[in-house]
A protein has these predicted regions:
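Alpha-helical cap/lid subdomain in secreted, periplasmic
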Residues: 27, 54, 64, 80-216
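N-terminal helical cap/lid subdomain that shapes the substrate entry/recognition surface
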Residues: 75-79
């Protein structure tokens, strides 16, 4: 009888521990990292107005428990991103929103080089079991049609090759509206960021759902 009582007590304790552990895992917010350049960093904006901050607030307003670290660096290129990817996105990150290439295009860097760097980052994240949401960029018109034809398809091609969700153009809805831009006519203002968040939300929400399904 004593053995049965001890065994029963042991089972109760184990069940309680497992239940508590499961609840703790369920309560843990999804941890994302926004990894990119000035468009991700929030150039000349207060930290609370950046894309990552506004996106986190919008997701939480919909009841989605998430934290989004801002690993955007103004002026960063794909080669700069590749050099810092491992330490900017720590192990244990649930997912990374990868946005780089705008400065490559502005500087006329070879699209083939940009694609190679982005692919190396994607492969590195995947080897660390960190899901990737890829954010697309388009070459500015002043770079010419030939450059655009080589640069613009990069993101779709990488998304298809690596099975990634893709948000095709980060500045969709902003790039042609000066009221949503800073005076430099290159970077979004606070209202512009809000438009970017609104337009990208469905893609980000689907990405988070995929992360949740993979963690079960």
């Amino acid at each position: 009888m004593r053995f049965k009582a001890v065994a029963a007590q042991f089972i109760v304790i184990c069940t309680a521990v497992l239940t508590a552990s499961f609840a703790q895992a369920q309560d843990k917010p999804v941890q994302l990292v926004g990894f990119g350049d000035s468009l991700m960093a929030g150039y000349q904006l207060p930290p609370t107005d950046s894309y990552t901050a506004q996106l986190e607030a919008a997701l939480k307003a919909k009841g989605i428990d998430v934290t989004i670290a801002n690993a955007g660096v103004s002026g960063d290129t794909s080669s700069g991103g590749l050099a810092r990817a491992e330490w900017s996105v720590p192990d244990g990150t649930d997912g990374v929103i990868l946005e780089l290439g705008a400065n490559d295009a502005l500087r006329g860097i070879s699209p083939e080089e940009t694609e190679k760097n982005l692919e190396a980052m994607i492969s590195g994240f995947q080897k660390r079991n960190i899901p990737v949401l890829l954010i697309g960029i388009m070459a500015p018109p002043n770079m010419g049609d030939d450059y655009a034809k080589r640069f613009n398809p990069i993101y779709q091609r990488l998304a298809e090759k690596h099975g990634l969700p893709l948000y095709p153009f980060f500045l969709d809805g902003v790039v042609l509206d000066e009221s949503l831009q800073l005076e430099d006519r290159m970077h979004p203002n606070t209202k512009g960021i809000a438009v970017m968040v609104e337009k990208s939300m469905p893609t980000v929400e689907a990405f988070i759902k995929t992360i949740g399904a993979q963690k079960k």
